[in-house]
């Protein structure tokens, strides 16, 4: 099952010509999970993978640069006759937020469900879960970790044959975890299956100061997407505003033993090369994605996460499994 992180907005609190405000979309198989929806996010989608029918949205917190894209995108979905229900998750206060946003959006013809998550709460998916964890931003705020379950080990057909298991339905039954009969008695799945294989983990912090809860949630993760708002010269400002410096984000990644660190929420006043130099002095496997970059996350036995520059840009083939039928344009009003 393919897993990709599509970076729609990688900038700081103020959008710039090159970096939009916060939004990342994880695509796992055919499921699209959006994390934060800053101003202009639907335009970023239209310029990249298309205004795909996002399956669910996770908000880390309710500062404007993380939520201002919601009213426009939800209204567009309504105007284009979306039928599928949409669930939006966020910290406590989500219902209060939508008392205000609802006045802008109005009633939608598709079902819109709001679910508040506390740290430790999890949303189940097919073979995975999205788990909320606490971050430190001076207000109620969640990070999120997509955590896959372990996968069954590889089936060894030759071992099954040696135990007298006939090819066909019995092979399939063993791979489903069922016991079958062999030439000398029962054959259990563990007799012919290798060790369980590790799933993947992607952790996203949203805005946060460095904290132990992120280290715990991102332990041994394949990818950590972390706030990197300030250079080391502004460490006190980072502390005062509940953000992280580049070096602090790198230190969290090093302590968590992640495979790759992606730095986001980068201010336009910094040169990306300088940002990366600061981070790599602390943690080498580090990238600073730009808008429309993609990180492909393979299963652990198949390699390391890979940054694909402009991988989601309009006109490119895009990451595997992300493209969909375009949303129909609404008819012009009379």
Task: Describe the residue ranges of each PLM region.
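Cap/insert and terminal regions of metallo-dependent hydrolase folds
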Residues: 174-296, 323
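Long, low-complexity, intrinsically disordered segments
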Residues: 317-334
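Active-site-proximal loop/helix segment associated with metal-binding centers of metalloenzymes
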Residues: 15-17, 126-216, 223-225
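Metal-dependent catalytic neighborhoods of phosphoester/phosphodiester hydrolases
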Residues: 69-77, 101, 271-280
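Divalent metal-coordination and catalytic microenvironments
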Residues: 5, 36, 45, 61, ...
């Amino acid at each position: 099952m393919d897993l990709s992180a599509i970076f729609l907005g990688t900038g700081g609190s103020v959008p710039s010509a090159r970096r939009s405000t916060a939004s990342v979309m994880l695509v796992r198989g055919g499921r699209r999970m959006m994390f934060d929806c800053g101003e202009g996010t639907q335009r970023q989608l239209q310029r990249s993978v298309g205004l795909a029918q996002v399956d669910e949205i996770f908000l880390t917190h309710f500062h404007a640069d993380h939520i201002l894209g919601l009213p426009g995108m939800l209204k567009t979905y309504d105007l284009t006759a979306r039928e599928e229900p949409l669930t939006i998750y966020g910290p406590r206060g989500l219902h209060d937020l939508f008392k205000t946003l609802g006045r802008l959006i109005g009633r939608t013809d598709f079902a819109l469900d709001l679910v508040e998550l506390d740290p430790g709460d999890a949303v189940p998916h097919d073979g995975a879960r999205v788990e909320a964890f606490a971050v430190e931003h001076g207000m109620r705020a969640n990070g999120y970790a997509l955590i896959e379950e372990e996968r069954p080990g590889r089936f060894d057909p030759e071992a099954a044959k040696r135990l007298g298991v006939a090819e066909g339905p019995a092979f399939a039954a063993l791979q489903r975890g069922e016991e079958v009969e062999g030439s000398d008695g029962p054959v259990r799945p563990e007799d012919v299956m290798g060790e369980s294989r590790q799933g993947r983990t992607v952790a996203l912090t949203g805005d946060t100061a460095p904290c132990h809860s992120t280290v715990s949630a991102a332990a041994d993760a394949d990818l950590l997407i972390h706030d990197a708002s300030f250079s080391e010269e502004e460490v006190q400002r980072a502390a005062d505003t509940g953000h992280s410096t580049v070096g602090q984000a790198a230190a969290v990644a090093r302590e968590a033993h992640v495979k790759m660190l992606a730095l986001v929420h980068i201010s336009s006043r910094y040169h990306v090369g300088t940002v990366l130099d600061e981070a790599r002095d602390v943690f080498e496997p580090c990238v600073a994605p730009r808008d429309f970059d993609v990180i492909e996350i393979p299963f652990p036995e198949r390699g390391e996460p890979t940054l694909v520059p402009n991988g989601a840009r309009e006109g490119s083939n895009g990451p595997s499994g992300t493209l969909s039928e375009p949303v129909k344009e609404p008819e012009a009003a009379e």
